[in-house]
Design a protein with these regions (language model features):
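Conserved alpha-helical scaffold segments that buttress catalytic/binding sites
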Residues: 2-249
Length: 249
């Protein structure tokens, strides 16, 4: 572990993708989740609605619940003055891609030389088939921007290994619970909803977390599209009504 000196300054980041907090099996992810890169909320909501309107996939999605024990550990961490200052800068968005500029902004403001990231996430976000910066490869871009000065730990969902096959490099990064970072101190906080990877019926839990963060930290910026839960029921009803109308013609 690198020791900070007058010539080194490490920016410590807690990155939270709320898709981590899903209690979900691999089959449901593979058959019921929209996938896609950085879909806007409006588009991913329409895609999700198709799965909720279909009885077979709706039944699978209804089995997706929240990892309450892990979420409670996160709440405890966020409330602790030992882990976060009240003045901690916070950014809350839909896509994880926005963390890239957020990190660069505070690397400059803190005059930091090193970056230490704990990523709580269902996905590793190191690489995909896209060379351009996106929600699924932002970590590799940060790593390339700060070669030999970037340290990453990944708290992975229990289903992550089943879905995405850890190689040895990824396996070395993995921590199995938020409990493992209970003594960490962080400089900045990032949270994303990842609309194409979070089952919308769990949005209420995300919004409860936003409320906690907003009360705890005054320096918080929240993207408009994630300030309220997605209205899946309205679109599902429209799909069903359109189908009934079509069948009666």
């Amino acid at each position: 572990m690198k020791i900070e000196t007058q010539s080194t300054r490490s920016l410590k980041i807690l990155s939270i993708d709320f898709d981590y907090f899903q209690n979900v099996d691999a089959d449901t992810i593979r058959s019921c989740y929209p996938d896609g890169i950085d879909l806007p909320t409006e588009l991913s909501t329409i895609v999700w609605s198709g799965y909720y309107a279909n009885e077979r996939t709706r039944n699978k999605l209804s089995s997706v619940t929240i990892l309450n024990d892990e979420l409670n550990l996160l709440r405890k961490l966020l409330k602790s003055k030992d882990n976060f200052r009240v003045s901690t800068p916070v950014l809350i968005t839909n896509s994880h891609v926005h963390i890239y500029d957020f990190i660069h902004k505070y690397m400059d403001e803190y005059d930091a030389t090193d970056v230490n990231i704990v990523n709580i996430d269902m996905h590793h976000d190191f690489f995909n088939k896209n060379k351009e910066l996106d929600c699924g490869n932002w970590l590799s871009h940060i790593y390339n921007d700060y070669p030999n000065h970037c340290n990453v730990s990944w708290i992975a969902n229990p289903v992550s290994n089943i879905c995405y096959d850890f190689d040895q490099t990824l396996n070395n990064l993995v921590k199995n619970s938020i409990q493992s970072i209970k003594d960490f101190k962080f400089d900045i906080l990032f949270l994303c909803r990842s609309d194409n990877w979070l089952a919308p019926h769990l949005d209420c839990h995300f919004n409860d977390l936003i409320k906690l963060i907003s009360l705890r930290f005054p320096n918080v910026c929240i993207e408009k599209s994630v300030q309220k839960p997605r209205d899946i029921n309205c679109i599902v009803n429209n799909i069903r009504n359109a189908y009934l109308t079509q069948s009666q013609l």
